[in-house]
């Protein structure tokens, strides 16, 4: 709502004052506190507020900018009209056919009637822009009239904040509906080019058109849903024109608005400021904006109502022409940077797990939000959504671009930066340790050791386990030293096809494979690698595939009646449990009979990741742990992948029903935002390092151990997972929550070109039936490229394709993505 003098009339209060509960005082501001309301609806509402929407597509043929204000009544509409006025003049002068229109969109407007045409208080913003932005000089200069397309998408009569107007008037609009209206409007406004015009158009140059989307109030003013509009519009991430505050106190509000936008990942193309009372607020803002490369444009104060603004606009035409040129230069530079990355990325990067000689098309990721990347498409000159089907290498836990997470990280960076950890304590690390021990470590762990990533977490775990084994068995550590001619050998009991990371120690806990045989001359497999029984959907039913080495003379198992039956504890008394026990015991005993010590057991519980996405029969792993425990062999759970709701439960321990001695967590630990890992251990394990000699301490460490930003990210992520868990309705129907449509995967498993499928928690897996299966297989490469062209950023493990979401993703979204996946796969098969 436009108020010329940028002052507010005093209105009587619309509500009586109410007493709100006072939250407990906190001396830190990381993490989230669950709602104190006990109703399920309140819990669900808080859960819904955690999630970020996906990405909305829009064309880059015509530059589009979003106008935010550092407050209400500071001249957003006045500035918008000036920019549109300048753009119409430029468009008329150049007579561009394909540059697109000049347009102004007001998504939400209060203080007008529902049609947006009759103002209750003052003039509607769209009407104001339409009046002052038209080309009044066309008759004298003989230029073609270039109109401004002005529209209001949703409005209320009451001149208050949208959330309050919606409440008072009894009609509202959801954020999803608002974004859909806006995206559709932007699509309609884009120029409809002929093939000839598309060929002639320079995608790296801004046309003469320009579209402005003006927000309501300040940067964090709410939409009708009470969510900050800076969060709601983040799904588009349009570059911003920030209108600063020229009044007394406006320096602070302008700076705060700028920081609120930056922390949410917006690009600020320009700041416009209507100065008041000759305060020169721009001069105070300029040192910071200059550092950020953001130009500031200033205008003189506007005359008071009811004096018209025609002369004011004429006096400022040159300023607005500069603003418009700057915005178009920003747009052009953005497109040129996309092109530069597309051309040069492969020449400067060395991508992991990539054969550069066969690298495919580079995806230019402009940003990410929710479960999707915002990717630049040079062929259509658009930014479009691409579902992050690999959860950015299995890390995504709270959605990309989550503003609550961004705020927590900024707070920790501002309060601490990085501080030394040994013999020190800081709030983020202390709070995180308490949360870890009260959740995944509850009942068994007492110590938390921090490191950098999953691989190093497992390295630490192996050092812990071997020390525990050596002392428990009253051995001398020196007998395992590499400089001893007759040194004893100590190895790890692990699973065939396992993968625990890329550092040398954990590389050695893996069989010879494509992951290690040409990677390091010091690689030596130091383990007993047990083949594991695998669970999958085949021909529509859950089957357990048991290698003959395990099964012996045991008859083939009948298909299980349901997925939940896989985790039924009554299977512990089945004949199959005895078969598993005999196999594990024989593997350990036969190894130790040769004089080799089995000093630790290391397993990926339930789901093995990089080795091929295999669901391991939990009965087998439970038996393995029991056999190791009977022999005082420390057991490590590598939950780097499986931990923190990846499998639909907090920890794979919840599905196995048996505790480890040591466990490793990463990836989802920090919500997928920053790298960090934690290795949890029991007090018995800790005590094996508790001695008088420094040399007997755990001499392992990283420069950024327990860095505050990482700990703050983890605390925030764990709080979000807790809120998610609180909002769920307990059910006895399913032991494991699955986000993906099992019926679709069961049907897929009946196809002749599919070897197996399954889904557990946030993971869905489809293995193609091929002759040369394995990680080195290229059979899925064509399908991967087809999926990426059709909105799904998938990766594969050889012939095994998978999709992964975050714990905050809705099942409806998963169904949408899975449908797209299956459709593209079936179309490709039909062509063969």
Model-derived regions: residue spans:
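Conserved catalytic-core segment of NTP-binding enzymes
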Residues: 208-210, 215-293
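C-terminal lobe/tail of nucleotide-utilizing enzymes
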Residues: 33, 46-50, 258-336
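Phosphate-binding/switch loop-helix module in NTP-utilizing enzymes
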Residues: 162-223, 577, 581
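N-terminal mitochondrial targeting presequence
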Residues: 1-60
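Conserved glycine(s) of the Walker
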Residues: 74-75
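Hydrophobic anchor at the beta1->P-loop junction of P-loop NTPases
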Residues: 67-68
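Conserved N-terminal phosphate-binding loop of PLP-dependent enzymes in the Aspartate aminotransferase
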Residues: 332-832
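N-terminal phosphate/diphosphate-binding loop that engages ATP/GTP or pyrophosphate donors
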Residues: 58-64, 78-177, 188, 192
């Amino acid at each position: 709502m436009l108020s010329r003098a940028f002052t507010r009339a005093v209105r009587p209060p619309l509500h009586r004052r109410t007493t709100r509960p006072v939250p407990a005082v906190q001396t830190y501001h990381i993490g989230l506190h669950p709602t104190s309301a006990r109703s399920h609806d309140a819990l669900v509402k808080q859960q819904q507020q955690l999630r970020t929407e996906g990405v909305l597509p829009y064309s880059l043929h015509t530059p589009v900018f979003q106008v935010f204000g550092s407050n209400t009544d500071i001249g957003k509409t006045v500035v918008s009209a000036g920019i549109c006025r300048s753009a119409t003049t430029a468009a008329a002068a150049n007579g561009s056919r394909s540059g697109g229109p000049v347009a102004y969109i007001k998504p939400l407007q209060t203080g007008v009637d529902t049609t947006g045409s009759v103002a209750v208080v003052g003039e509607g913003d769209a009407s104001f822009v339409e009046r002052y932005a038209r080309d009044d000089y066309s008759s004298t200069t003989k230029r073609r009239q270039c109109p401004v397309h002005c529209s209001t998408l949703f409005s209320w009569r009451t001149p208050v904040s949208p959330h309050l107007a919606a409440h008072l008037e009894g009609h509202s609009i959801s954020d999803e509906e608002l974004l859909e209206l806006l995206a559709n409007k932007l699509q309609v406004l884009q120029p409809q080019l002929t093939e000839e015009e598309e060929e002639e158009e320079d995608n790296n140059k801004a046309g003469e058109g320009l579209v402005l989307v003006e927000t309501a109030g300040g940067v964090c003013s709410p939409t009708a849903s009470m969510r900050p509009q800076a969060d709601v519009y983040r799904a588009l991430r349009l570059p911003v024109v920030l209108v600063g505050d020229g009044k007394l106190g406006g320096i602070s509000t302008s700076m705060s608005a700028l920081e609120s936008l930056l922390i949410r990942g917006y690009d600020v193309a320009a700041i416009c400021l209507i100065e008041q009372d000759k305060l020169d607020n721009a001069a105070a803002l300029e040192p910071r904006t200059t550092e950020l490369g953001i130009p500031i444009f200033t205008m003189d104060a506007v005359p008071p109502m009811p004096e018209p603004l025609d002369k004011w606009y004429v006096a400022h035409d040159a300023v607005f022409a500069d603003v418009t040129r700057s915005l178009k230069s920003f747009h052009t530079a953005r497109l040129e940077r996309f092109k530069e990355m597309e051309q040069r990325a492969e020449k400067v990067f060395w991508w992991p797990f990539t054969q550069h000689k066969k690298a495919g098309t580079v995806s230019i990721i402009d940003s990410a939000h929710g479960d999707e990347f915002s990717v630049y498409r040079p062929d259509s000159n658009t930014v479009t959504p691409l579902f992050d089907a690999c959860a950015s290498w299995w890390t995504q836990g709270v959605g990309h671009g989550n503003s609550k997470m961004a705020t927590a990280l900024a707070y920790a960076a501002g309060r601490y930066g990085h501080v030394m950890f040994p013999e020190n304590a800081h709030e983020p690390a202390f709070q995180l340790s308490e949360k870890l021990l009260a959740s995944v470590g509850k009942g068994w762990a007492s110590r938390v050791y921090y490191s950098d990533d999953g691989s190093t977490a497992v390295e630490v775990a192996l050092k812990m386990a071997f020390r525990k084994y050596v002392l428990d068995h009253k051995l001398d550590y020196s007998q395992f030293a590499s400089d001893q001619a007759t040194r004893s050998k100590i190895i790890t009991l692990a699973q065939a096809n396992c993968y625990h990371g890329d550092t040398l120690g954990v590389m050695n806990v893996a069989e010879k494979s494509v992951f290690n045989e040409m990677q390091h001359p010091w690689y030596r497999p130091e383990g007993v690698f047990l083949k594991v029984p695998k669970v999958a959907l085949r021909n529509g039913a859950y089957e357990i595939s048991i290698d003959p080495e395990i099964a012996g003379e045991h008859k083939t198992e009948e298909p299980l009646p349901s997925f939940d039956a896989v985790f039924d504890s009554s299977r512990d008394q089945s004949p199959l449990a005895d078969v598993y026990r005999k196999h594990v015991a024989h593997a350990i005993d036969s190894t130790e009979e040769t004089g080799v010590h089995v000093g630790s057991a290391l397993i990926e519980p339930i789901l093995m990741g990089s080795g091929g996405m295999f669901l391991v029969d939990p009965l087998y792993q439970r038996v393995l742990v029991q056999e190791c425990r009977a022999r005082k062999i420390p057991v490590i759970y590598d939950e780097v992948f499986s931990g923190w709701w990846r499998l639909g439960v907090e920890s794979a321990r919840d599905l196995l029903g048996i505790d480890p001695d040591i466990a490793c967590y990463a990836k989802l630990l920090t919500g997928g935002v920053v790298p960090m890992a934690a290795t949890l251990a029991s007090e018995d394990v800790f005590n094996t390092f508790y001695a008088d000699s420094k040399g007997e301490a755990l001499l392992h460490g990283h420069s950024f151990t327990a860095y505050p930003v990482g700990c703050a990210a983890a605390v925030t992520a764990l709080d979000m997972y807790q809120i998610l868990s609180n909002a769920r309705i307990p059910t006895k129907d399913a032991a494991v929550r699955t986000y993906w449509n099992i019926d679709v995967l069961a049907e897929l498993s009946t196809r002749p070109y599919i070897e197996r499928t399954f889904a557990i928690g946030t993971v869905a897996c489809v293995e193609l039936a091929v002759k040369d299966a394995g990680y080195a297989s290229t059979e899925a490469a064509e399908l991967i490229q087809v999926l990426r062209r059709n909105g799904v950023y998938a990766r594969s493990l050889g012939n095994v394709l998978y999709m992964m979401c975050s714990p905050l993703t809705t099942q409806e979204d998963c169904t949408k993505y899975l449908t797209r996946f299956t459709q593209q796969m079936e179309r490709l098969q039909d062509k063969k």
